[in-house]
Each structure stands twice: as C-alpha cells, then as structure tokens.
Regions:
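Histidine/acidic residue-rich metal-binding segments in metalloenzymes
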Residues: 12, 104-113, 133-239, 256-278, ...
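Active-site gating loops and adjacent loop-to-helix segments of metal-dependent hydrolytic enzymes
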Residues: 37-71, 175, 193-211, 236-240, ...
Length: 338
C-alpha cells in the first residue's frame, strides 16, 4: 500500500463531514454578492486596502458601466462555480439603486430562470444607497416583485439607522417577505446594531422572519452585554448568517475589548439555540479579491475560528439552517438523507 493510500484509509473528519453534507443535498450559501463576482482587476487591487465604507462608493464605477449582460455573466459564472464546488442553493444580494438601477436585478432574474431547480437562487435587494431617500426608496418599491428577500444596510442611512430598519420591517409586513440585514460589520464595541435589529423585530411582530448578517461586533462586547443581547435575540427568534473569510481580515486595533476572533460568535449563538447559517459573502471583487466562494473553506474557518467540532451542528449550519434562513424550508423534506 502506498503512502497516499494509507492516508486515504485513515479517518479524516473534514472529509467525512463534507461527504455527509453532500449526502444531505450539498452546501447552502446563505449570503453572497454574485452580481459583483469576478470583477476584480489588477488596477482595482490598489483599492483593496480601502475602508469598507470607501469601497461602498468605489464600486459605483463598475455599476455605472455594467450592462444586464455583464451582470448576467458574473452571476452565471458564480453559480456554475458554486455547483462545481458542491453548493446546491444560494441567496445573493443584488444592487438596486440609482447607479445601476435595475440592470443587476434583471440579470439575476434571468439567471434564476436559467438555472431553475438545478440551483435554487434566492434574490435579496442590496441597498447601498439606503432606503430612506426618495429615489432609492422608489426603485426598491417598484422592484418589490422581482426579489424574494428584503436586504438592509442600516449604516448607509447613518444617523437614521432605526428608520432604515423600520422601513424594512414595514415592507416586510406589507409583502410577507423575509428580511436579511447587514449589522455590526466593523468588529467594534461602538456598534450595537444586532441588539437594535432584535428589538425592532419584536416591536414589529416579525419574530422568526428576520436574519442578522455578520454581527461581528457582538463578539467585541463584554460577556454581560452579549448575554443580554442573546436573550433579546431568542425572544425575536432572530437568525444569523456567518461569512467567516469575509471578515477575518479585520485590521488590528489598540482598543481594549474581550479577546475574540473577527467572526460571528457562532459558538455562543448555537449554545443558546439560535439558528446560524453559513455564507461566502463577496467573491473575487474589490471587497474580497482572493475569496473564491468555496464553502468548504468557509466551513473550515468556521470550525477552527469558533471551535465547533460537532458534525451534527455543522451539518445543520451549512445545509438545514441555510435553507431555513433563505426561505426554502419547504425543500428540506426533499433532501436525500442517509
């Protein structure tokens, strides 16, 4: 027996887990931005060190010139790669704003129809220009039938974050759509958006319909505060999406905070019975030029970053919880389980 054959016959927990995930239908990528996938260029690499907020504006250069066809090719390439990497469904945020107007959402709808049941694609509106100013608000409202999930980014309506979330919740109550909101992305204790989102979920009676995407800054707070927020999240039945490789690159700071990795505190969330799913976030763009969307990489980083070694819990996170948070829970009974 060769050395390679000997190694292949040994127990490999990651390989065993991946095979099990595949037997349960494959990975679910619960948060991505396929419309911007593979847009990185050598020139853009100069801007990859910019602050997140600066990148929000920088991508206007691409959006302003991208046609429906350009967007479709990005989304199609991303989905084909996801299929190759054994991901079987995804939720992609898609820009709808005065810069790109409806080009990205039109392309996403074409891709949705093109792949059909081969790759169920759930579309969420990305609100990079906020939801409160008249023009962005009008564009989103007029496209309400074209996407399945209301996406939010409260930081884009700075100083009016509560109003931003209120508007999302009002739309959700009118349409019955789920809500996914980017919160606490700066890994800093000055942010308390997860708490705000949970409280607003309860206030609007949308328990079980809202998902917090990222919630990094939660881990930067003292344990007493985290425990308080977890209780509110339980009352709100708030779910979460963790995108490990998207945020592990947060720069070092001199702030004194509890020791933690720059990851969603998934270990603490699951211990308290909160639903957590996994996503890739950006793929080969100015935000994450080296991220390829491979969910096995995301799984590995989650396992080691949060020290979650329970294969049953990990299976739930990458498959079952994924279908639940992107609104495809009805597909769970169709999965082939062994």
């Amino acid at each position: 027996m060769t050395h390679t054959e000997t190694l292949m016959n040994r127990y490999n927990p990651l390989g065993d887990l991946v095979r099990r995930i595949q037997s349960h239908g494959g990975f679910v990528n619960s948060h991505a931005h396929f419309d911007r996938a593979y847009t990185i260029t050598p020139k853009m690499m100069e801007r990859t060190q910019d602050h997140l907020f600066e990148k929000w504006e920088y991508v206007d250069n691409f959006k302003r010139n991208a046609s429906v066809g350009d967007y479709f090719e990005n989304i199609k390439a991303a989905i084909e790669t996801q299929l190759f990497l054994t991901t079987r469904a995804a939720c992609t945020f898609v820009d709808i704003d005065p810069i790109c107007e409806y080009n990205a959402i039109t392309a996403a709808k074409i891709a949705q129809e093109h792949f059909g049941d081969e790759f169920p694609l759930i579309i969420a509106c990305q609100t990079l220009k906020g939801v409160l100013e008249p023009e962005p608000k009008r564009l989103i409202e007029n496209a309400m039938d074209d996407f399945q999930i209301l996406g939010g980014l409260p930081a884009k309506d700075k100083g009016r974050e509560e109003e931003h979330i209120d508007q999302l919740m009002l739309w959700a109550k009118d349409t019955g759509k789920r809500v996914h909101v980017h919160v606490d992305q700066l890994n800093h204790p000055s942010e308390k958006e997860t708490e705000l989102l949970a409280r607003k979920t309860i206030e609007h009676g949308l328990e079980g319909k809202v998902t917090a995407v990222h919630s990094l800054s939660l881990a930067a707070h003292p344990k007493s505060y985290r425990e308080e927020v977890y209780k509110i999240c339980q009352d709100a039945n708030l779910s979460f999406v963790c995108c490990p490789s998207a945020w592990i690159d947060h720069p070092r700071r001199e702030d004194l905070v509890p020791s933690h990795n720059a990851l969603t505190p998934v270990d603490e969330l699951v211990e308290r019975g909160l639903t957590v799913a996994l996503g890739s976030d950006n793929i080969c763009d100015v935000y994450k030029p080296f991220c390829d969307g491979d969910m096995i990489n995301e799984l590995r980083l989650l396992i080691d970053g949060c020290k979650i070694y329970d294969p049953d819990e990990l299976l739930n996170i990458v498959v079952y919880n994924g279908y639940e948070v992107i609104g495809l829970a009805d597909r769970l009974e169709d999965l082939s389980v062994f």
